[in-house]
C-alpha cells in the first residue's frame, strides 16, 4: 500500500547561512553604522538585539528577507509580540519549530478527513503518516495540503509504493 509521511523540519544549515548573510548585511548597511546590532543563532532560536525598537523591527525584516532567499519558511516561527527592553538594548526572540506538535497533527488529520480523500491518516510522534490504495490519491492529498492554511511549513518524505 502506498504511503508517505508529512513532517515539518527546518534545514539548520540554511538557517545558519541566512543568519550569517544577515549579519554580513548589517555590518555594511548605512543605517546600522555606529549602532550595536546583533543577530545570533542558538538551537533553532534566533535572537535579534539592537539599541531601539525600530532597529529591531528592521533586523527582523532583514532576517525574514534572507530566510525567503534561502527558501526557509517563516510561517511556523514563534515570535514575541513586542521586543523586550533591558538596559540599553531591545531584544526580539524568534524560535523555529521542529516537528509537528499534537494539536497541529490533529488539525492536519481532520483537514484530510473533511476533504473525503480515499486515504487513511495516523499520527506517529512528530509526523503524520498517510496511506492509500493508489498513488494518485496520495498525490491528490499532497496537493490539498499545499492549498491549506496550516501555519507550519510541511514537507513530504518517505514516499513508498
Swiss-Prot record:
This protein's UniProt keywords: Nucleotide-binding
Can you tell me which residues the record assigns to a coiled coil? Answer: none
**Member of which family?**
Belongs to the YajQ family.
Q: What is the recorded function of this protein according to its Swiss-Prot or TrEMBL entry?
A: Nucleotide-binding protein.
What are the recorded GO MF terms, alphabetically?
A: nucleotide binding
Q: Return any one Pfam family short name.
A: DUF520
InterPro entries, alphabetized: DUF520, UPF0234-like_C, UPF0234_N, YajQ-like_sf
Cross-referenced SUPFAM superfamilies? YajQ-like
Superkingdom, taxonomy of origin: Bacteria
User: Which cysteines link up through disulfide bonds?
Assistant: none
Tell me which PANTHER family the record gives.
Answer: UPF0234 PROTEIN YAJQ
- Which Gene Ontology cellular component terms are annotated? cytosol
Keyword flag Nucleotide-binding: yes
Q: Write the protein's name.
A: Nucleotide-binding protein lpg1167
Amino acid at each position: 500500500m502506498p504511503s508517505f509521511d508529512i513532517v515539518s523540519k527546518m534545514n539548520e544549515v540554511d538557517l545558519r547561512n541566512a543568519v550569517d548573510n544577515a549579519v554580513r548585511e548589517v555590518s555594511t548597511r548605512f543605517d546600522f553604522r555606529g549602532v550595536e546590532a546583533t543577530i545570533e543563532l542558538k538551537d533553532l532560536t534566533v535572537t535579534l538585539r539592537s539599541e531601539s525598537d525600530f532597529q529591531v523591527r528592521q533586523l527582523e525584516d532583514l532576517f525574514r528577507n534572507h530566510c525567503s532567499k534561502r527558501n526557509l519558511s517563516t510561517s511556523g516561527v514563534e515570535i514575541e509580540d513586542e521586543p523586550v527592553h533591558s538596559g540599553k538594548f531591545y531584544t526580539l526572540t524568534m524560535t523555529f519549530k521542529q516537528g509537528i506538535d499534537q494539536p497541529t497533527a490533529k488539525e492536519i488529520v481532520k483537514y484530510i478527513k473533511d476533504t473525503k480523500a480515499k486515504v487513511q491518516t495516523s499520527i506517529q510522534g512528530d509526523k503524520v503518516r498517510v496511506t492509500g490504495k493508489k498513488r494518485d490519491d496520495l498525490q491528490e492529498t499532497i496537493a490539498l495540503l499545499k492549498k491549506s492554511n496550516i501555519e507550519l511549513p510541511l514537507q513530504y518524505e518517505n514516499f513508498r509504493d
